[in-house]
Structures are given as structure tokens and as C-alpha cells.
């Protein structure tokens, strides 16, 4: 039984250095000497044994410390030997305990150890960083001014927003936005105005949505990413974002670069200019909350689970809304739009024919296929095989149902009239299928059981899926991603795990385990193998992410690049080179020092704050200003009484030992000292605690 005692009743404040001290740390007993525990001044143990901290003793008289004994063992070993042996204890746990006990030398050594894997410049995959933009000011009136709303001399097809001002660009201050708390979103959750909510990319453009406005960046080969558009401030949080940066085969003069944002049932659409800037096209109403917003070519599509679909056609400038069955999934390929519904039907829309076949406000939505069990179609993926003849593509559709069944249906171009035929069925999930992807080489399905993933290898003959030998099971794994219950950690639409990537290439999942995580894991969608992990360079939580397939340079031999875009809670945006990560998959990195090797090197010196030893001298860099080195090999200074090198060093320098580069670097390290204002140089001390100082030597052309 532990008994509390005062400093008088407990361990005496003064005792012999060789006195044996018995400790009970978390139920495990340790015995050591007073000298071992108190050689570091102002530590937890020196305060404990001097009576400044009241003690708690167990039934045997041992001092009880309610800490982890497993972590305490390497700490006690360090106090005994001044050498660090982690003994399997994680570095962060060891650092936390060392800070608790106030063991400054050990804390500094562990902090240097952590610097091996941390850098404000990221790792080799870090490709760029965009700071938070200037936020638009809050408007004081709700009436917009008349702007350039005429398109080709005709009035705009829809009303202008009376709740939006003209494009303010970069007007306003960041502080004004952050000082004003945002109103609650339609979901009732609080909003953080400064964090990135959504990120999307298309070709060489990026759209980033904050709570009440969005910005667009354009990649230029010579100057990198440049801010191209900033929207006015909106009254409600942005919940959906879509970007179309290039429309193939578009008619001259039509909008080929557009960005759209949805909030509630309203959709706002802007046209972007290649040279920068943009203009509002209009505001469209779906009538029900928008749950999916995307472009198919130059057609803007909005859907809701209620069964309502809205389409804005860039040619006719017409907004059309139509009711179908409750929509539970969708996918698009080419000009085909497929809608999966709760009644088991898959509806087909050819958006390319909208201007030609629009009749009586009918979008010509036709039923393509109905599930044999009439289960709800909860996930859809369509794959168009390369054209092998003039007849067209072989259409392959994979879909998942609410009962966990995965089916593959195919339609040959020559049998379009007969409809798709059921090709394969997999009953491997016991929860509803939430995602599915049919690519050139793999079939991937994800169910609602903590993102359980099943994958198959797809066999093809002349580009078409084949039954010989058929699809074979490949992998089973989970992409665990916890969601926040209080709305923090970002918008759920901005934290989609994927899979990301072109269907004829390797695809990846992006895993964010906890809502406020600053680290993301990139994994192959086919096997679950880790490709890489990235951590925010500024330590802020990651609130949104996506993968961008970016066009290659015009230079000879260049190829498209794949980037991971991460939006942070502080409003910044970071970019990571996934192409390099994929190229290096499976290669063992040839790194520098290991943690064990670094600890061995640090045992030869002591670490102390540089500011305390250099006075008011400026530090060369934030990183190197943390610590300075002290000799620990002997009790005498490396420099003699007059500041001259020790005999071995003087002899080596007299003989010109070392390479030319080594001598240049040595002199360069001492050169900055010569530029400081002349001050009386203190006499070097022979104590252990003084840092090494550079030689005060006059340089001339023969110094090398």
C-alpha cells in the first residue's frame, strides 16, 4: 500500500552520493544510487530527492512513481551509462517521458533523432506549396452590381445571383474572414472558414473550395502554379465542387474552362479565362439538395438521391431538370452517363445528343439494365474498350448492390438493340457495396464494412474481357478511414478514398485514418500495398485531398505526371509527386544514417541550446539553432590556453592533411566568425560545457 509522506518524512533532502535509492515505477521495482539519479540538475529526480516534491512510498519504503516501467528502463540506463538504448521503446514515447522527468540531455538527443524524418521542406515527393489565398471581404449589402453578363450579345439564360457581388478578385483581408465565425451549414455542423473543404483538378487546373469562396490555380510550364480566379464570398458553405479545364472537340467560342460550386440546392457556375479571371454564367436551382456535381464534357450534371437530375448544356445554354427513380450511384465514360437507382435499374443518358434530341423538356433517360434481384445499385463503373472496328466500343459495366453482390455486364456494339448481358457475379460482400472500379487489368469493389476491399485480376483478349481463364481473386484488405461526428476534419466529400487514376494505369487509394490526421497513406488499389506516406510540411491537419493527372511538358520525352493534392486546415495546399513514388515502388531507399547510427554518433558529444552559448549572434538557420556541440570525450578543451589547435590538429594542418575540399569547408565554417563585430574574445574554458568555437585565423591566398 502506498503512503504519502512529506519532504521531511520522506527521503532526506541531503544524502550521501552512494546512497541506494529504491524506486517503484508502475509496480516494477528499480534500485540505483542517488548519484545516478541526480547528476542532471533541476530534473524530476533531483527535485524529488531534495524534498522539493512530496514523495509517495509503497509498503516496502520504495518511492512510488506512477509511470510506465517499460519506458523507464531505458531512461534509467541512460542515467547510469549516458548511453541511449531504446530497447524497443518508440522514440515519441521515450521523448515524452524524458520531458516529464526533465532530463535535458536526453531530450535534446531524442529531438535530434526525430529530425531524421521531419523537415519543413517535406521529402523527395514534396513538389510544391501554395499558401492560403487572400480571403474576400464580407459584403455589407446583398445586391450585386451589373457586370459583363451578356454572352455573345444575348441575355444570360438564367437569372443573375442577387446575393453575389461582382468578382472581387483578391480584395479583402484574411484576418477579416477568420475573425467572423461562419454560420452553420445546412447539416447543422460548425464550419471553419479558413480550412480547405474541397479540392479537385482537371488537366493543368486546380480548384480549391473554402467555406465561403473558391479559387482556381493554373499550371504554367515556366512559372509554375499561378492564381487564376477567385470567387466572391458566398453566403453558405460550399458542399460540392466541379471543374472542367478542357473540352475536347468543343465548338469555337463556347466555354471550355468552367468551375461550379453547389451549396444546398443552388449551383453557381463560372467561366474561366486562360489568361486569368472569370465571369459568372449563372445560378441554377435543382430544387433538392445537390449530392453529386460533375462535368461530362462541357455539360454540367447535378444529381440528388431523391431522383432528380439537372443538366446544363453549354451549347444551348439551357438548364433542364428531370425526375427519375431515386439515384444511389452514377458514373460516366466518354459521353455516356449511367445512373444507378434504388429499384435495381441502371439508366443511360447520352449527353452528347442533348442539343439534337431534346424533346418537350425530356432528357431522354432510358433504362439500360435491371438487376435480376432488383437490389439497389449502390456503385457503378463503366469501361469503354478501345475501338476494334468501325462498329464502336465494347461497353463493360461493373456494379455493386445494396445486398453486397458485384456483377459485370457487357454489351457488344453489334448487339446494341438487345441490351447488356450478364457476364459475371461475385457474392463476396455482406455489406452494401459503396465503390466499384473496372479498369483494364483489375476489378475493385469496396463495401461499407470499414471500407473492405476485394480485388480481382481481369483477363482480356484483344481488349475485351474474357472468360478464359476469367477473373481471378487477387487481394482482400481494408482502407480504414474514421469519420468525425462533430464535422471537424474536413468535408466528407473532400476525403474520398478513391480509387484514383486512369483506368489503363495503376490506381491508388488515399487513406486518412483519423479525421484530424496530418499524414496520408497511398496504397495500390489492386493489392493494398503501400506506395508511400506523406505528412503535411507545416504540421496542420489534412482536411481534403485528391489526385490530379497533369499534362506533361512540351519538352521532348516528357510524360504526364500524377500528383497528390492535400488541402490543410490552415488553408494551404501541398502537392506531392505520385509518379516518382510509383516509379520507386519496391526499391529500397539508400538512406543516410539510421537512428541507431545517429545515436552512436551523438554519444560522443553533449547537446546544449545554441542561444545560451553564442549570446546575441544570429543563428544561421532555424534548424541548426536548436543545439550546439560540446566535447564529451575528455574533460579538457580541444583548444589550448591561447586558442591554438591541439598538437595533433596543428601538426595535421602544418602538413596540409586532408583534401582541398575538406580544408575549404573547414575554413568556410570559420569564416563567418570573422565577419562579426570585434568583441573581446573570452578565454576558452577547460570545462565540459563550453561549445566548440571556430579558429580566429587570418585568411590569405595561401591558406589552402
Swiss-Prot record:
One of its GO terms (cellular component) is lysosome. The modification Phosphothreonine is found at residues 163, 693. Changing residue 623 to A: No loss of interaction with SH3KBP1, loss of translocation of SH3KBP1 to EGFR containing vesicles upon EGF stimulation, strong delay in the degradation of EGFR upon EGF activation and enhancement of EGFR signaling induced serum response element (SRE) transcriptional reporter activity. The keyword Repeat applies. The modification Phosphoserine is found at residues 644, 646. A motif (PXXXPR) lies at residues 618-623, 678-683. Its main location: other. Residues 146-165, 609-704 are annotated as: Disordered. Transmembrane segments: none annotated. The modification N-acetylalanine is found at residue 2. Residues 612-631 have a biased composition (Low complexity). GO terms for molecular function: identical protein binding. Keywords: Acetylation, Lysosome, Phosphoprotein, Repeat, WD repeat. GO terms for biological process: positive regulation of epidermal growth factor receptor signaling pathway; protein homooligomerization. Residues 19-88 form the BTB domain. WD repeats lie at residues 233-280, 283-322, 324-359, 428-466, 548-586. It is found in: Lysosome. Belongs to the KCTD3 family. Inhibits CBL-SH3KBP1 complex mediated down-regulation of EGFR signaling by sequestration of SH3KBP1. Binds to SH3KBP1 and prevents its interaction with CBL and inhibits translocation of SH3KBP1 to EGFR containing vesicles upon EGF stimulation. Monomer. Interacts with CUL3; interaction is direct and forms a 5:5 heterodecamer. Interacts (via PXXXPR motifs) with SH3KBP1 (via SH3 domains). Directly interacts with cathepsin B/CTSB. This is SH3KBP1-binding protein 1.
Amino acid at each position: 500500500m502506498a503512503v504519502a509522506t512529506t519532504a521531511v518524512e520522506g527521503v532526506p533532502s541531503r544524502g550521501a552520493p552512494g546512497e541506494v535509492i529504491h524506486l517503484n515505477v508502475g509496480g516494477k521495482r528499480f534500485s540505483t544510487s542517488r548519484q545516478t539519479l541526480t547528476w542532471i540538475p533541476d530534473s524530476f529526480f533531483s527535485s524529488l530527492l531534495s524534498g522539493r516534491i512530496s514523495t509517495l512510498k509503497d509498503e516496502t519504503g520504495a518511492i512510488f512513481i506512477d509511470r510506465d516501467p517499460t519506458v523507464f528502463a531505458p531512461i534509467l540506463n541512460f542515467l547510469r551509462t549516458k548511453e541511449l538504448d531504446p530497447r524497443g521503446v518508440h522514440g515519441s514515447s521515450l521523448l515524452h517521458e524524458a520531458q516529464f522527468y526533465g532530463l535535458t540531455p536526453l531530450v535534446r538527443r531524442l529531438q535530434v533523432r526525430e529530425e531524421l524524418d521531419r523537415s519543413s521542406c517535406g521529402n523527395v515527393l514534396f513538389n510544391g506549396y501554395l499558401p492560403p489565398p487572400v480571403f474576400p471581404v464580407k459584403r455589407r449589402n446583398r445586391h450585386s452590381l451589373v457586370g459583363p453578363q451578356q454572352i455573345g450579345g444575348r441575355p444570360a439564360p438564367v437569372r443573375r445571383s442577387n446575393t453575389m457581388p461582382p468578382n472581387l478578385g483578391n480584395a479583402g483581408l484574411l484576418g477579416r474572414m477568420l475573425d467572423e465565425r461562419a454560420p452553420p451549414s445546412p447539416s447543422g455542423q460548425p464550419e471553419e472558414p479558413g480550412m480547405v473543404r474541397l479540392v479537385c483538378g482537371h488537366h493543368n487546373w486546380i480548384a480549391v473550395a473554402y467555406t465561403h469562396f473558391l479559387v482556381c490555380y493554373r499550371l504554367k510550364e515556366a512559372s509554375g502554379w499561378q492564381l487564376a480566379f477567385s470567387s466572391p464570398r458566398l453566403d453558405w458553405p460550399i458542399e460540392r465542387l466541379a471543374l472542367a479545364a478542357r473540352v475536347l472537340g468543343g465548338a469555337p467560342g463556347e466555354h471550355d474552362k468552367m468551375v461550379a460550386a453547389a451549396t444546398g440546392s443552388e449551383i453557381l457556375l463560372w467561366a474561366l479565362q486562360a489568361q486569368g479571371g472569370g465571369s459568372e454564367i449563372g445560378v441554377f436551382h435543382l430544387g433538392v439538395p445537390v449530392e453529386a456535381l460533375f462535368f461530362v464534357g462541357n455539360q454540367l450534371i447535378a444529381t440528388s438521391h431523391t431522383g432528380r437530375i439537372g443538366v446544363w448544356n453549354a451549347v444551348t445554354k439551357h438548364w433542364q431538370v428531370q425526375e427519375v427513380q431515386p439515384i444511389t450511384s452514377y458514373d460516366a465514360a466518354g459521353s455516356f452517363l449511367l445512373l444507378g437507382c434504388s429499384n435495381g435499374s441502371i439508366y443511360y443518358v447520352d449527353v452528347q445528343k442533348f442539343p439534337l434530341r431534346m424533346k418537350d423538356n425530356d432528357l431522354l433517360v432510358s433504362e439500360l439494365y435491371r438487376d435480376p434481384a432488383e437490389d439497389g445499385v449502390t456503385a457503378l463503373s463503366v469501361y469503354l474498350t478501345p475501338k476494334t472496328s468501325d462498329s464502336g466500343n465494347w461497353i463493360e459495366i461493373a456494379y455493386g448492390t445494396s445486398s453486397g453482390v458485384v456483377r459485370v455486364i457487357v454489351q457488344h456494339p453489334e448487339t446494341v438493340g438487345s441490351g447488356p448481358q450478364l457476364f459475371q457475379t461475385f457474392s463476396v460482400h455482406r455489406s452494401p457495396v459503396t465503390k466499384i472500379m473496372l479498369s483494364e487489368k483489375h476489378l475493385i469493389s469496396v463495401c461499407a464494412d470499414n471500407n473492405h476491399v476485394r480485388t480481382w485480376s481481369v483477363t482480356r483478349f484483344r481488349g475485351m474481357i474474357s472468360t478464359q481463364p476469367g477473373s481471378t481473386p487477387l487481394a482482400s484488405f481494408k482502407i480504414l478511414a474514421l469519420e468525425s461526428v462533430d464535422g471537424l476534419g474536413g468535408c466528407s466529400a473532400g476525403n474520398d478514398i478513391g480509387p484514383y487514376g486512369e483506368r489503363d494505369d495503376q490506381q491508388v487509394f488515399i487513406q486518412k485514418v483519423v479525421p484530424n490526421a496530418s499524414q496520408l497513406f497511398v496504397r495500390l488499389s489492386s493489392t493494398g500495398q503501400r506506395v508511400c506516406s506523406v505528412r503535411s510540411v507545416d504540421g496542420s491537419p489534412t482536411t481534403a485531398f485528391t489526385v490530379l493527372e497533369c499534362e506533361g511538358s512540351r519538352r521532348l520525352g516528357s510524360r504526364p505526371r500524377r500528383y497528390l493534392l492535400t488541402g490543410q486546415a490552415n488553408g494551404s495546399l501541398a502537392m506531392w509527386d505520385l509518379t516518382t513514388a510509383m516509379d520507386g515502388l519496391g526499391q529500397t531507399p539508400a538512406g543516410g544514417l539510421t537512428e541507431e547510427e545517429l545515436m552512436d554518433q551523438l554519444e560522443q558529444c553533449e547537446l546544449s541550446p545554441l542561444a545560451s552559448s553564442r549570446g546575441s549572434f544570429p543563428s544561421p538557420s532555424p534548424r541548426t539553432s536548436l543545439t550546439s556541440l560540446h566535447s564529451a570525450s575528455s574533460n579538457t578543451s580541444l583548444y589550448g590556453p591561447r586558442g591554438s589547435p591541439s598538437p595533433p590538429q596543428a601538426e595535421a594542418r602544418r602538413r596540409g592533411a586532408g583534401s582541398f575540399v575538406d580544408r575549404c569547408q573547414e575554413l568556410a565554417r570559420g569564416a563567418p566568425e570573422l565577419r562579426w563585430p570585434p568583441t573581446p574574445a573570452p578565454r576558452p574554458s577547460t570545462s565540459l560545457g563550453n561549445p566548440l568555437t571556430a579558429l580566429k585565423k587570418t585568411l590569405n591566398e595561401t591558406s589552402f
